[in-house]
Amino acid sequence: HLYFNDLRKFGWIKVLDEDGLEQEVSKLGPEIEWPEFTFEYFVKALHSKARTKVKTVLMEQSLIAGIGNIYSDETLFKAKVLPTRLVKDLSEGELRSIYDSISPVLELAIEHGGTSLKDYRRLDGGQGDYLHFANVYHRASQPCKVCKTTIERTVVNGRSAHFCPNCQR
């Protein structure tokens, strides 16, 4: 049996031979645990899209594989950077903070089985409970867990972006 549950309608299934698979994988940037995902690579990748909002660049799979909407919001919250900032306006310290925030956010998400929205399930049928640990994602109009300021939601490149206007600059 093959089951494909694509709640958000972003997924696809392709049947590929080895060459086709290699072509598809070659379109992806490195995953964060790969040795080539260094701070230097990260800065170069982001600067290649300098006039783009940082949230959009973090979700660009050809630059960095594996960061989607939820984890870009959470990474930027941890780094204290607004999702609407242009890459060209970020300091080296802010870039370092974003880079250093990616792994802990994704590790926590993996530890909690990811995020289950509506009817999404893991392969074992269970639900991921990361959303209970999220600081900003899906928390618009609720108080920030850090400062109690109301979490806001905006749209960045067609995707929702959640942030704390006090904690993030």
Residue ranges and their predicted role:
Residues 102-104, 121-132, 145-149:
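Short Cys/His-rich Zn2+-coordinating modules
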Residues 131-140, 154-157:
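Short, flexible, mixed-charge glycine/proline-rich loop motifs
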Residues 72, 151-152:
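Short functional micro-motifs and their immediate structural scaffolds
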Residues 144-147, 164-167:
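Short cysteine-rich clusters marking metal-coordination/redox-active sites
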Residues 1-66, 71-78, 86:
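Phosphate/anion-contacting hairpin/loop surfaces
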Residues 80-89, 95:
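RNA substrate-recognition surfaces in RNA-acting enzymes
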Residues 61, 138-141, 161:
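Residues immediately within or flanking Cys/His clusters that coordinate Zn2+
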Residues 94-111:
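Basic, amphipathic alpha-helical segments enriched in Lys/Arg and hydrophobic/aromatic residues
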